[in-house]
Amino acid sequence: MISPYFVPRKRVGALRSYKFAKHLKDLDWQVCVVHLEVKGQKLSDEEKLALEGVELFELKTPFDRTINRSSSDLGEVDPHISNHMESCNLTETQSQSNTSITKYKIPLPNRSEYIPEDQEKKEEGMRAKKDIVQVGAPIQRVIDRFECYFPMDTWYPLLRSHLNYMEQILIQEKPNLLWVTADPWSGLSVIRTLSKRLGVPFVVDFRDPFTLCPIRSAKKSNWAKKVEKNLEVKVIQEAAAIVFTADETLKLYQESYALHADKMHLIHNAFDYDFLNSSAQLDQNMELEQNNELFRETNKLSAFIDSSANRDRTSTSEGSSKSEPFKLLFLGKFRSSSPIEPLIKSFLVIKKNHSTFFSNIRLYHIGTLENQVQKELENLGLTRQFISLSPIPYDRVPDFIENFDGLISLLNPIRNMVIPSKFWDYLPATPPIISIGTNLEMKEILTNTQRGYQFESFQTEEIAQKLYELQVQRGSFSLKSGTSKKHLNRIVRFSAKHKTRELSDLFLSVIKN
């Protein structure tokens, strides 16, 4: 496996490779992984145990700016809450926890408008680090500008410099098959060279669209686009198989490269924990879990949610169950690929039609909002409804999301060929999913598993009404009591074990042919 991004890095692509590696090992594959080193981070005890028997080879890096700036990094970030925040309980508890994962600060511009004065004083010691982030911003802008004219990505020179070392690894290990993840994209060029040198077939995990991605292509110069298109054509011609993570992406490439459509396959991303076992025994195991360090840390993460909810209850009538805050979670950052606008418009509909419910609804999201968005929320009277959280450590996500009444998935209509990674974290959970987007495959999965509902971004009236209905009937939904066995089985099909079996079958078919 040539997987430049791999654990302990917590990018989506790194976690996909990690899940495959550990489960392929259980299917009697001898797995070797070549990956970029992650400075300052180490494998967790759980990761070490899962990867026993898997050979790991690190590629040295002089520096790495992707660890703390990637929007797809799911690692632990030192917690701060922006926007509507009246307590620093979460910050205090997380900062006391011991972890081997490097912590990074989230820059919080213009926070004085949203943070109480006493909270500002408690954060005096952090301002020097904020300044460091600001100083680095011009450098990053220069790098981003350079990447517009650079084909693939700026990892290519480094990976190219390690070609001979990677070749020596392959000569030593004598693999039957090479597998590469296109994260970063420069891995595609590397795998072609290695395959030719050793005569070993290769499988490419494209995951998302490469040159056919409208958002990515818009950021590249015409020259860079031509180079990338030429590389993509050659990779598709030479690869033994190509894997995508969404049906829309698969169809897009099968139409564009019809002569090679038969070598293209769909293997979704997946969740990676035995939710059926934990769901069925959740009540019985509660006392045991509370003695578990991981569970205690998760409770620390949710402490802010609970304390915030308690404060909100005091502002409404205590006797009514409808006075309880209705908590939604968007396990991501608002950006062009996951726009905030549909939620703003839906909340305005709720404000107009259901004033009591509006006063109780809260949406927790990862990261800070842009200044322009913060001002818009303030002008519309929505600042109390949107609450920022720090990124949640990946291994604590399953327990953390159970604190909420609903889970939000957002997808820009022009990116309907992909499925957001957070969707797979939501799927085996208990709270219902509200998907806002146009990906038909997601809608089909939600329908077949009875896990939620999908709306297009303009359906703000319908979104508002569904949220109101969920608030009225919350507590009646449960994977244990309200979901039939056949629907549970449909959810299990998207587990990492099942998806790895699909990948294993594909590998065997390539080797036999």
Regions found by a protein language model. Give the residues of each.
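Conserved donor-binding/catalytic core segment of Leloir-type glycosyltransferases
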Residues: 289, 295, 301-306, 321-338, ...
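A charged, aromatic-enriched C-terminal amphipathic alpha-helix characteristic of glycosyltransferases
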Residues: 458-462, 475-510
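Nucleotide-activated donor-binding/catalytic signature segment of Leloir-type glycosyltransferases, i.e.
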Residues: 358-396
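Nucleotide-sugar-dependent
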Residues: 12, 338, 393-400, 407-425, ...
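Carbohydrate-associated surface elements
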Residues: 248, 270
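Membrane-proximal helix-turn-helix segments that form the acceptor-binding/catalytic region
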Residues: 153, 164, 186-189, 193-197, ...
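N-terminal subdomain of nucleotide-sugar transferases
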Residues: 1-88, 92, 96-115, 241, ...
